[in-house]
Amino acid sequence: MASEAPSPPSPSPPPPASPEPELAQLRRKVEKLERELRSCRRQVREVEKLLQHTERLYRNAESDNQELRTQVEELSKILHCGKNEDNPKSDVEVQTESQAPWAISDYYYQTCYNDDSLPSKETELCVQQSQCAQASALDPQDESHIDSGSYAGADATEGVSHRQEDAVTSDSQESVSALAEGPALEGSSLAESLRAAAEAAVSQTGFTYDESTGLYFDHSTGFYYDSENQLYYDPSTGIYYYCDVESGRYQFHSRVDLQPYQTSSTKPNRERRLKKRRKEPGFYTANEEKDLSSEDQKVCSVEYINCSEDEHSGNVKKKARTDTSHKSSPLQLTVAVSGDTVESPGDDNSASSKDERIGESESEPEEGEITDSQSEKSYDGDSSSGDRETSEESDDEDEERIWPPCIRVIVIRSPVLQMGSLFIITAVSPATIGREKDMEHTVRIPEVAVSKFHAEVYFDHDLQSYVLVDQGSQNGTIVNGKQILQPKTKCDPYVLEHGDEVKIGETVLSFHIHPGSETCDGCEPGQVRAHLRLDRKDEPLVGPALSKEEKELERRKALKKIRVKYGLQNTDYEAEKALKNPKYKDRAGKRREQVGSEGTFQRDDAPASVHSEITDSNKGRKMLEKMGWKRGEGLGKDGGGMKTPIQLQLRRTHAGLGTGKLSSIDDVHLIQNKSKKHWDKARERFAETFTENKPRKETPGAVPWVTGTAE
């Protein structure tokens, strides 16, 4: 039986695949995913930034839209108020203010116009007319003694003024009716037609147009309206007001100085009365009409030049007060103020000679007015002087209430401001004191010790004086050497007086309170700087030499000023402030402890000598050996140079060159100088004395010392 063929060997199983390629693929996938994740995060951040920017733009747009809505509402209200008014093109003389008519309760004139306390002005006007008619019927010769009325600005009128008013009113009504009926009026131009229409429209608002002056008179308030400047004029005080639409009140704008014309008899009385008032403690809080502050006059947008006494002295004698309030305008007006005749600045050529003759014949002269018939008529001096005094006192009180004084601030001492600088503070608006540049302070003091908004000065109408309020400053405020408050706390109002010195930081300010434009030598910049220059001249140019203690004192003072300048007066000097910081690491100290340092600065080699050989570590010897030199050979290329060292030669002290033979240091014995000899002798004497006194100390004190030897 044949043997079976051997079976082929079974194939071996394939070896398992190595995990390395799979791991590499996984790593690549992970890296790819990480890159994608980073890119996604970057995109998300960009989208978030874009979203924030869009939201910010949306908020800004919403705020702008809200502001526009409020503006549209305000404009719609204004349009609603003036939709019934017609504003045709007209001449400048008849332009009116496009505002709704104000009620009597809306007028405001220094707290004198109230809805409940004051009656209607038309009723007062009628009462004044009846009083004037009765007074003229009882005593026609004493017409000059009739008072102008309790209400200033509305004069008593007579028949002439009524006839003129009726004529003007009838003309305006006829012109309006003619315009309504036909296209044009015969014998009248287009300007006259427009003027008549404007007068008819204005008459409905309570204003009456005055053709001679081009102004409008309001019977309810007694004010004249200037359409060019949109101002209201009070003829009794010479004050101009503007109408505040938001509050519905008259606000002060400017004032015309009414220059009084007084007789020789009234001037001494007024001077005596002013002297008495100066002695009173509250006099400096009042302001006369002539004591206007120059700064207050600069605020006025419309300036009026007062007529001089020389220019109008002749006109005052000719003009008398007419009863028509329409022809007595604020620019050409003669009214009774404090019993004196006062004429406002204006154009004297506008009134005709015929009107002047009518005024002379049918009107009464003002009280205290200088007329041609004054020399012929005698007046009751006692009654007239009494009336004048009472009226002047009342007007003085009005002026005190209307015109508070101003403050002139002078820089007395300051490291940053020029000494003698002047700052003026008025009662119109509060004044601020601080360091910040962008806050537009009245008195800016660029010091470190001064806060950004340090203090505020304003006029308190209740106290009738200026007050200082510290706004919680860092270092506080000092007035006359006393600190009015603790730092960082807002203080109560501090009443300022004339001559107070206020210290803010290192700056000292002097406050001078004067009525009107009055000044003193202490608040005039020229006077102050002149005194400072004189003080500098008196100082010696070259001072005496300072001692060491005085120099140290000056150094300490200068150091203290530097600390105050940079705000370091409350901090102590620290020598090693950086080393005391816990975050500081002294790496140099650790390196010195661990590694150490070689003292290369300390020389440890022995000095050179001609008797000892140079060591192998000598750098000069090493250089010679590198160049081929060997021990025992001479210098040079062939070794034929010198072999012995250079000997040290000495010469005599203080001897010139070539005076003696140089000798070697080995052959010369150093001669001791005189001082060394003296020291040696002193040592010998000391040694002898010490050896002689030493046995004496050892012997007892009771036994006397005896020379000689004892047996």
Swiss-Prot record:
Main location: cytoplasm
GO BP term (any one): cell differentiation
Polar residues: bias regions: 167-176
Bias type Basic residues, positions: 270-279
Phosphoserine PTM sites in chain numbering: S7, S12, S344
Residue numbers of N-acetylalanine PTMs: A2
Skewed-composition ranges (Acidic residues): 361-370
InterPro entries assigned to the protein according to its UniProt record, in alphabetical order: AGGF1, AGGF1_OCRE, FHA_dom, G_patch_dom, OCRE, SMAD_FHA_dom_sf
Top-rank lineage group of the source organism: Eukaryota
Modification N6-acetyllysine occurs at: K661
GO CC annotation terms, alphabetical: cytoplasm; extracellular region; perinuclear region of cytoplasm
Location of this chain's protein in the cell: Cytoplasm; Secreted
Segments of skewed composition (Basic and acidic residues): 287-297, 374-391, 579-606, 613-623, 690-699
Alphabetic keyword roster: Acetylation, Angiogenesis, Coiled coil, Cytoplasm, Developmental protein, Differentiation, Phosphoprotein, Secreted
Region described as Disordered: spans on this chain: 1-23, 137-184, 260-297, 311-400, 579-623, 690-711
Start and end residues of each G-patch domain: 616-662
Domain FHA: 431-484
Coiled coil region boundaries: 19-85
Recorded GO MF terms: identical protein binding; nucleic acid binding
Database matches in SMART domains: FHA (SM00240), G_patch (SM00443)
Compositional bias of kind Pro residues: 1-19
Pfam families membership: FHA (PF00498), G-patch (PF01585), OCRE (PF17780)
Alphabetical list of PANTHER family matching this protein: ANGIOGENIC FACTOR WITH G PATCH AND FHA DOMAINS 1
Known role: Promotes angiogenesis and the proliferation of endothelial cells. Able to bind to endothelial cells and promote cell proliferation, suggesting that it may act in an autocrine fashion.
Quaternary structure (record): Interacts with the secreted angiogenic factor TNFSF12.
Full protein name: Angiogenic factor with G patch and FHA domains 1
Organism annotation: Mus musculus (Mouse)
